[in-house]
């Protein structure tokens, strides 16, 4: 049995979340080793899907005291395995698209043919391909939503189903698993692993907290700021795992020795506020960059398929202000409205943070080198486009016109394998043993989502969906954007955000085209909203991790998360409607 919240000392709380391979077919009681105590280290990169499923089981242990662990989820998965094929059959027999919607331009049939059987160019053949594609897409979506099998396994289904049923050739599907934005995310992951390997992320976090202040409100602000900044570059889950033991040390300090004259209620409020602040800041910070969270990179990759390019700097200039505003509102709600922390100083808190800082010692050579690579990479991402557009410089340095964000990310990743941490005897900044901890499942999810979108386009299913929304263009754009954001925010409370975005992007793109809207009006709010699931522990791995600390009750998380869901549902449409056109490559405004 796990120790009670009152007996959990700060030094004993170090989470090590296993890869999802260890979670499958494992006895329920064994899932307790998801939460390891006694100062054990943290795995450098955590699989979000595995973390979410594993922590769901661990949290259910806390709630049910070890009885009937995981039965609900296991039942949900079993039904999902059956429901996927059954729903596919139902869609195939019930979906009867009009043949007139599939007129084929002369000379286009051979290019779009997906298999030898599809060489017949009659509209009936295209209607049949559309029916099959719709059925198989529903099968994949159901398995993603229910997690009937591990999400990366479902992401491999397009490679089997679509060529197997003669919809497209294997090459058409497989090429999407090598999209350049998958390699952008891979490079970002390797940079994050190097930061974690040499403890640079911990130093940045402690320095940020020390710089903000030591009153309860300032401490929450410092933790949220540090968490949000790190999650811009590092996995949201790994950032939360790293920040949690520091936060729990601070909560323990409040319980043992406090300079405040308040009651135990104040200590409890501070603990809840700090834990929620860490979880929410991890999700919010990831919104700010393309490498901060998988839905952002998936959006960029999908748009790249359609000839719409979003650069790292363009996204950051648009999304960073949104993340900052949402972070400030979240801090204000937590510390002033919902939990009302006092503004008095707690001198012993500063001593605790300084003690943790001193344990790190002076910055080592590897830390300086990793920091240099990180800063150079971030600067290159931000300055690449302005420098390439500077005719005087680009004329003398033609390389500027040839590189892109993925090239920069891979160059940075490769350099980490070439720069020694010690010129005489030390290892390199990154080796393959450390780099192999990459969340390969997330990269497969990218490929699965992009391949599904490509097949929907190739089979004309996306075109048919768009034709059903031809009248949508008459509606006010703002309310369309708001409806998309609101739907995705609450939908991702119960489903994986990456799986949700993978399934919705091709549908929303088709809807936008059918309604004569620029696709960015629908796709951008969907990607942003996927990071704003704040209500339930199972909504995101950061939520699950802090809920498992024992300092948060379900009611407190639901109540606080509902406030933030509403705030995000208002902020995202406002930012997209009034700001996105100034930074992102809109081709048509559709605005008044």
Q: What name fits each language-model region?
A:
Residues 36, 139, 146, 152-265, ...:
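Membrane-embedded alpha-helical segments and adjacent helix-loop junctions characteristic
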Residues 39-41, 46-104, 111, 186, ...:
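Juxtamembrane and boundary regions of transmembrane helices in multi-pass small-molecule transporters
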Residues 72-77, 105-107, 119-130, 171-180, ...:
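Interfacial loop-to-helix junctions that mark the boundaries of transmembrane helices
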Residues 82, 133-137, 152-156, 220-225, ...:
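Hydrophobic alpha-helical transmembrane segments
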Residues 86, 90, 137-141, 160, ...:
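Generic alpha-helical transmembrane segments of integral inner-membrane proteins
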Residues 99, 139-156, 173, 237, ...:
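Flexible hinge motifs at transmembrane-helix junctions and intramembrane kinks/re-entrant loops
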Residues 141-149, 226-235, 279-290, 417-418, ...:
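Transmembrane alpha-helix interface/packing and boundary motifs in multi-pass membrane proteins
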Residues 180-190, 232-243, 316-331, 401-411, ...:
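Alpha-helical transmembrane segments
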């Amino acid at each position: 049995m796990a120790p009670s919240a009152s007996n959990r000392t700060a030094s004993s709380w170090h989470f090590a979340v296993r890869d999802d391979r260890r979670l499958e077919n494992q006895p329920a009681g064994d899932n307790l080793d998801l939460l390891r105590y006694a100062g054990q280290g943290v795995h450098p990169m955590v699989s979000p899907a595995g973390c979410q499923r594993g922590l769901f089981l661990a949290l259910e242990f806390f709630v049910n005291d070890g009885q009937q662990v995981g039965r609900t989820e296991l039942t949900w998965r079993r039904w999902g395995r059956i429901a996927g094929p059954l729903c596919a059959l139902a869609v195939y027999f019930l979906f009867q698209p009009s043949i007139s919607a599939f007129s084929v331009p002369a000379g286009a049939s051979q290019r779009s043919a997906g298999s030898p059987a599809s060489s017949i160019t009659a509209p009936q053949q295209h209607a049949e391909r559309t029916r099959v594609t719709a059925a198989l897409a529903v099968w994949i979506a159901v398995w993603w939503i229910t997690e009937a099998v591990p999400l990366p396994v479902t992401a491999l289904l397009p490679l089997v189903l679509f060529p197997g049923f003669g919809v497209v050739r294997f090459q058409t599907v497989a090429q999407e698993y090598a999209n350049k934005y998958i390699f952008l995310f891979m490079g970002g992951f390797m940079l994050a692993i190097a930061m974690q390997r040499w403890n640079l992320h911990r130093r940045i976090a402690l320095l940020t907290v020390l710089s903000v202040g030591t009153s309860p409100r300032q401490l929450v602000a410092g933790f949220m700021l540090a968490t949000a900044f790190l999650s811009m570059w590092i996995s949201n889950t790994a950032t939360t795992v790293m920040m949690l033991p520091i936060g729990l040390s601070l909560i323990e300090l409040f319980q043992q020795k406090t300079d405040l004259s308040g009651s135990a209620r104040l200590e409890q409020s501070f603990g809840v506020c700090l834990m929620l602040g860490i979880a929410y800041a991890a999700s919010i910070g990831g919104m700010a960059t393309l490498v901060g969270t998988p839905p952002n990179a998936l959006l960029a990759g999908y748009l790249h398929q359609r000839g719409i390019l979003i650069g790292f700097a363009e996204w950051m200039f648009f999304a960073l202000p949104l993340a900052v505003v949402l972070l400030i509102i979240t801090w204000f709600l937590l510390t002033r409205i919902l939990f009302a922390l006092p503004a008095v100083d707690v001198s012993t808190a500063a001593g605790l943070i300084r003690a943790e800082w001193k344990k790190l010692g002076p910055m080592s050579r590897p830390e300086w080198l990793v920091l240099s690579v990180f800063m150079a990479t971030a600067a290159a991402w931000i300055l690449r486009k302005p420098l390439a557009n500077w005719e005087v410089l680009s004329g003398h340095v033609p390389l500027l016109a040839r590189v892109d964000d993925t090239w920069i990310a891979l160059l940075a990743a490769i350099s980490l394998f070439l720069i020694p941490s010690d010129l005489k005897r030390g290892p390199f900044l990154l080796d393959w043993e450390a780099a192999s901890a990459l969340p390969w499942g997330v990269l497969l999810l990218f490929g699965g989502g992009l391949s599904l979108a490509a097949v929907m386009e190739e089979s004309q299913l996306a075109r048919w969906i768009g034709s059903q929304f031809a009248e949508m263009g008459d509606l006010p754009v703002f309310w369309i954007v708001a409806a998309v954001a609101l739907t995705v925010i609450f939908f991702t409370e119960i489903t994986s955000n990456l799986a949700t975005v993978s399934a919705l992007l091709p549908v929303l793109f088709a809807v936008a085209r059918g309604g004569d809207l620029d696709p960015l009006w629908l796709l951008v709010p969907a990607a942003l909203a996927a990071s704003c699931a704040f209500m339930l522990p199972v909504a995101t791995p950061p939520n699950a991790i802090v809920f498992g600390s024992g300092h948060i009750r379900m009611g407190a998380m639901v109540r606080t998360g509902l406030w933030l869901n509403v705030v995000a549902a208002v902020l995202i449409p406002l930012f997209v409607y009034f700001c996105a056109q100034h930074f992102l490559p809109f081709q048509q405004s559709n605005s008044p």
